[in-house]
């Protein structure tokens, strides 16, 4: 079977992106050493559990594995990739040139996504290797149109930017908890406080995004 996109690794980030790609109504393959994880995700998003050999023939092959094993995984793909396959790597701190050298191809895209991609509101940063064509890039952007905002950035800046986008959600959740805890301490039911906090953050973020003002100017 030929897949438009396949994912090696179905952890938090791999699952979030696979869910986003599934919204583009694409044929998706999933592989994980933990077969039950792959099967559970496949059932929930309408994907197919596959092998690494089949995944290597996909148009886009997402390597959603930890940084400490990604080079090993990339090396295992050398020589079995299809001519039009583009590798998409998301391992923090691992440069494009390292992935390209290990996999034996310069058709690689490096991305730094965040988990809100699972609900179509992610912030995905990306940069491309030398042999990624304009058509490849256009197909890649179309594939991730259901993930949120996708922005191209120089690789030398991607780690710094990803510190904001990748860690940011955790800070927002902590802030939301603090807001709701404060309301609960004043007698507001927990379920209502959680909704109020989430909507307040959502509305404020939308105002900030739609405004050309500095955040300080909105703090009135």
Residue ranges with predicted function:
Residues 38, 70, 189-197, 218:
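Small-residue helix-packing motif on alpha-helices
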Residues 5, 108, 158-163, 218:
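Short pre-catalytic strand/loop immediately N-terminal to key active-site residues, enriched for Gly-Thr
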Residues 1-50, 60, 121-122, 184-186:
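NAD(P)+-binding Rossmann beta1-loop-alpha1 motif at the extreme N-terminus of oxidoreductases
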Residues 48-53, 151:
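Short acidic-hydrophobic, aromatic-tinged amphipathic segments that line or gate anion-handling sites
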Residues 213-220:
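Short, intrinsically disordered, charge-balanced linker/junction segments flanking boundaries
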Residues 98-107, 123-161, 172-211:
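Internal alpha-helical scaffold of NAD(P)-dependent oxidoreductase catalytic cores
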Residues 17, 53-126, 130:
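Rossmann-like NAD(P)(H) cofactor-binding subdomain of soluble oxidoreductases
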